[in-house]
Amino acid sequence: MADHLMLAEGYRLVQRPPSAAAAHGPHALRTLPPYAGPGLDSGLRPRGAPLGPPPPRQPGALAYGAFGPPSSFQPFPAVPPPAAGIAHLQPVATPYPGRAAAPPNAPGGPPGPQPAPSAAAPPPPAHALGGMDAELIDEEALTSLELELGLHRVRELPELFLGQSEFDCFSDLGSAPPAGSVSC
């Protein structure tokens, strides 16, 4: 139950003798909560000086009252939940060009992942183009995109290399660059 919560708030469960419940008159049951059993009052009393002699204490009941430690209360789950999937870690490119990374599980290197004995081998990494991660695109997807955009009717498509040279002013104008200038 919530015995540990009641103790944290300063309450304890007190049992009253049956004759004390009858001394309050016929309307005493109206003030009782619906879960109170025979011989129990409201069940919760603020801690204070005990009215009678203290009950005998047991060694394990000091922190939890007469009920002992809560058996069903666990602050953390005993068993971690099963993982939704298995993640495969792959080594990353070296942070500094020209310097090789230490192999996994080597001294000074990162600890490598330990695959499960029944797990299949991870798929090979995608090929990188120009040192950047690239995702290969299916030829059928490109063909359907070409048809959808109407590019199949165009005889010659301009080459687009954004970020490398958006415009080359000297090749467009057909003249040589002035001496001592830097080309775009």
From Swiss-Prot:
Main localisation: nucleus
Bias (Low complexity) ranges: 18-28
UniProt keyword terms in alphabetical order: Activator, Cytoplasm, Nucleus, Transcription, Transcription regulation
Gene Ontology annotations of biological process type: response to estrogen
Family: Belongs to the CITED family.
Pfam families attached to this UniProt entry: CITED
Bias (Pro residues) ranges: 104-126
A single cellular component GO annotation: cytoplasm
Subcellular location: Nucleus; Cytoplasm
Subunit structure, interactors included: Interacts via its C-terminal region with the CH1 domain of CREBBP and EP300. Interacts with all TFAP2/AP-2 isoforms.
An annotated Gene Ontology molecular function: transcription coactivator activity
PANTHER family per UniProt: CBP_P300-INTERACTING TRANSACTIVATOR 4, MELANOCYTE SPECIFIC GENE RELATED CITED
Sequence segments annotated as region (Disordered): 18-67, 94-128
Protein name per its UniProtKB record: Cbp/p300-interacting transactivator 4
Function field: Acts as a transcriptional coactivator for TFAP2/AP-2. Enhances estrogen-dependent transactivation mediated by estrogen receptors. May function as an inhibitor of transactivation by HIF1A by disrupting HIF1A interaction with CREBBP. May be involved in regulation of gene expression during development and differentiation of blood cells, endothelial cells and mammary epithelial cells.
Gene: CITED4
Tissue occurrence: Expressed in most tissues examined with highest levels of expression in heart, liver, skeletal muscle and pancreas. Also expressed in bladder cell line ECV-304 and in various breast cancer cell lines. Also detected in both in situ and invasive breast tumors where its expression is down-regulated and mostly restricted to the cytoplasm of malignant epithelium. Down-regulation of expression is associated with elevated levels of HIF1A and increased tumor growth and angiogenesis.
Entry annotated with the keyword DNA damage: no
